[in-house]
């Protein structure tokens, strides 16, 4: 029996739907919408986002017999991984820390699976647990009316490309549910900062989400703006393709070896944190990093005053796990530059007064949450950055949940998903519903 009840039609005689459509849809999109075309009642949860987080929650809900629908604005699961990452990307942490609930990675996979291996794992995971998202469905607004969540969506008729916004259709479908799971994650939208004179630059400029590999960059002078994991790896990839790469370092950053003495730095640190304080583990990790790299400040990469794991706990700032970039910096194959003062027609002026010409600028300036743009709720999520106001929070009020916002990567996704599904099942039990679990 179909667990979703659909009510279709223009609803010309229903003022409730007319009022909601006019108030929520038109201002959010700027495109006139006559009214609601369809309302879908979901006797369970609406999950917004079909990345690893949304797929994991859907899989666990399905196993517990709880109805759900996953809404995804793109035409595939894990669209960030599939369409906005560089080809050489591998998981930065060992695979045991990146598994989704109930299914380990295949034993044949390397310790750090490639992007394509991870995507294959996600596709197989979704098939195994029967997670079938509603694709090309953009959520433009979601609000709680005192009883249910109303999630307003429009069909994506043309995907976003080249910095342009996606084109949305004119008909609206509303999903109404008791629970809303926000699974759009920390990296929903690229961050493109305002930079003085950027419009004057006549070379090529792109965000790192558009970069795939170094083919075609040989011999070109490329400036990578940003020194996080993406900036470091893009710079390394460019160097390996014989580009003349430079990397902007405008702030302090912790760079750690991905492995120490054959052990994962992250895994070793997590093991030590069972018995030692964060400050002690930071001291040990930084000592070992110094033995491997030397003083990174001499390379133009100063470290923060707080240790890497203490800094992560108080600010969410993730240390960089080096995969070979620092060796290229030491050899002079990758140049480190200070922050940009302003752009010129053919290059940039740096804050130290020096200037240099570049053919290409790649902005490895990160991503941001898009939750404030569509979720009409101000208590749980911050309007400033689109993250839960309390660190590691996964549960809000009125059946609102967040998965994948803990700044703990894929390991945090699994923890959040398990907590959310257990809470929903307990609420159903408290309401007197008994659902059979799938075997």
From Swiss-Prot:
Which source organism does the UniProt entry give?
A: Oryza sativa subsp. japonica (Rice)
Quote one Gene Ontology molecular function term.
flavin adenine dinucleotide binding
**How far does the signal peptide extend, from start to end residue?**
none
Name what induces it: Repressed by the transcription factor OSH1 during anther development. Reduction of auxin levels at late stage of anther development, after meiosis of microspore mother cells, is necessary for normal anther dehiscence and seed setting.
Functional description taken from the UniProt entry: Involved in auxin biosynthesis in anthers.
Membrane-traversing stretches: none
Its protein name is Indole-3-pyruvate monooxygenase YUCCA4
According to its UniProt entry, one GO biological process term is:
anther dehiscence
State the family it belongs to. Answer: Belongs to the FMO family.
Additional detail:
Plants overexpressing YUCCA4 are male sterile due to defect in anther dehiscence and mature pollen grain release at anthesis. Plants silencing YUCCA4 do not exhibit any visible phenotype.
Q: Which Pfam families match?
A: FMO-like
Query: Which residues does FAD bind?
Result: 49-54
Q: Which PANTHER family match?
A: FLAVIN-BINDING MONOOXYGENASE-LIKE PROTEIN (AFU_ORTHOLOGUE AFUA_4G09220) (PTHR43539), INDOLE-3-PYRUVATE MONOOXYGENASE YUCCA4 (PTHR43539:SF88)
> What are its E.C. numbers?
1.14.13.168
Binding, NADP(+): 226-231
Keyword Iron appears in the UniProt entry = no
Catalytic reactions on record: indole-3-pyruvate + NADPH + O2 + H(+) = (indol-3-yl)acetate + CO2 + NADP(+) + H2O
Q: What are its cofactors?
A: FAD
- List keywords of the entry alphabetically: FAD, Flavoprotein, Monooxygenase, NADP, Oxidoreductase
């Amino acid at each position: 029996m179909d667990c979703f009840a659909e009510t279709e039609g223009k609803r010309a005689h229903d003022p409730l739907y007319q009022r909601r459509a006019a108030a929520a849809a038109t201002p959010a999109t700027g495109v006139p919408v006559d009214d609601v075309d369809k309302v879908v009642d979901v006797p369970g949860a609406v999950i917004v986002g079909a990345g690893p987080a949304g797929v994991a929650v859907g899989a666990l809900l399905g196993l517990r017999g709880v109805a759900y629908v996953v809404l995804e604005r793109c035409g595939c699961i894990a669209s960030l991984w599939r369409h906005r990452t560089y080809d050489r990307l591998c998981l930065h942490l060992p695979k045991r820390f990146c598994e989704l609930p109930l299914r380990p990675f295949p034993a044949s996979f390397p310790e750090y699976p490639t992007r394509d291996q991870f995507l294959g794992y996600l596709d197989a995971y979704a098939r195994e647990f029967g997670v079938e998202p509603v694709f090309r469905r953009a959520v433009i607004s979601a609000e709680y009316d005192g009883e249910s969540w109303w999630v307003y969506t429009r069909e994506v008729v043309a995907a976003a490309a080249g910095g342009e916004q996606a084109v949305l259709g004119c008909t609206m479908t509303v999903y109404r549910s008791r629970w809303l799971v926000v699974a759009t994650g920390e990296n929903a939208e690229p961050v493109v900062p305002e930079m003085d004179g950027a419009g004057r630059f006549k070379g090529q400029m792109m965000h790192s989400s558009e970069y795939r590999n170094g083919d075609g960059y040989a011999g070109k002078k490329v400036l990578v703006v940003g020194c996080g994991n993406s900036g470091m790896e893009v710079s390394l990839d460019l160097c390996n393709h014989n580009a003349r790469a430079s990397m902007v370092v405008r702030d302090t950053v912790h760079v750690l070896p991905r492995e120490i003495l054959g052990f994962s730095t992250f895994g070793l640190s997590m093991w030590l944190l069972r018995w030692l304080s964060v400050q002690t583990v930071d001291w040990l990790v930084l000592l070992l990093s110094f033995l491997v790299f030397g003083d990174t400040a001499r390379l133009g990469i100063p470290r923060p005053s707080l240790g890497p794991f203490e800094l992560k706990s108080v600010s969410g700032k993730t240390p960089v796990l080096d995969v070979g970039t620092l060796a290229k910096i030491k050899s002079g194959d990758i140049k480190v530059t200070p922050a940009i003062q302003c752009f010129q027609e053919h290059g940039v002026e740096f804050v130290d007064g020096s200037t240099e010409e570049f053919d290409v600028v790649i902005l490895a300036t990160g991503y941001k949450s898009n939750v404030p743009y569509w979720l009409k709720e101000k208590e749980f999520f911050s309007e400033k950055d689109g993250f839960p106001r309390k660190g590691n929070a996964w549960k809000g009020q009125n059946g609102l949940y967040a998965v994948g916002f803990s700044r703990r990567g894929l390991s945090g996704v699994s923890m959040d998903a398990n907590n959310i599904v257990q809470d929903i099942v307990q609420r159903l039990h408290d309401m007197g519903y008994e659902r059979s679990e799938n075997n």
